[in-house]
A protein has these predicted regions:
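All-alpha prenyltransferase/terpene-synthase fold signal
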Residues: 1-145
């Protein structure tokens, strides 16, 4: 369950072929859960948001959580060790299932863009109040490390 369950699923998946829903499940419960917790804790501290706004922020958090992992998988496959600050290509070397190994680079990139779009849409009703969250989304998608 939760982040620990996601990590256990990750460790158990090494060397296995996962379906896209299984990979998403794993990342929703790992990186996604951490990002979602950060967003939702901040949202709940405001005491000014209604249930619909909280739901939209939750959708935003889920979208950027998965987007972060998709981009991480793309960087592992495409970037250099010097750029990443960690060993590039380690996922493939360790036979770990990734968005790139399941979808390929082109479709993984398309998925990252779709998740970015979903995140933006979730923030539509917040107008300028969500500017920083849009900037975080852009950073996640455009980062090089």
């Amino acid at each position: 369950r939760g982040m620990a369950g996601g990590q256990a699923f990750d460790l158990d998946s090494v060397g296995k072929t996962l379906s896209l829903p299984e990979l998403e499940f794993m990342h929703i419960h790992k990186t996604g859960a951490l990002i979602r917790a950060a967003v939702m804790l901040g949202a709940r501290c405001s005491n000014r948001l209604d249930d619909q706004q909280l739901s939209r922020l939750d959708h935003f958090a889920k979208s950027i959580g998965l987007a972060f992992q998709v981009v991480d998988d793309l960087l592992d496959a495409e970037a250099t060790t010097a750029t990443l600050g960690k060993t590039a290509g380690k996922d493939a070397e360790n036979n770990k299932p990734t968005y790139v190994s399941i979808l390929g680079i082109s479709q993984a990139r398309e998925l990252a863009e779709k998740l970015q779009h979903d995140a933006y849409q979730a923030l539509d009703s917040f107008d300028e109040a969500a500017l920083r969250l849009r900037q975080v989304t852009d950073f996640i998608i455009k980062r090089k490390f």
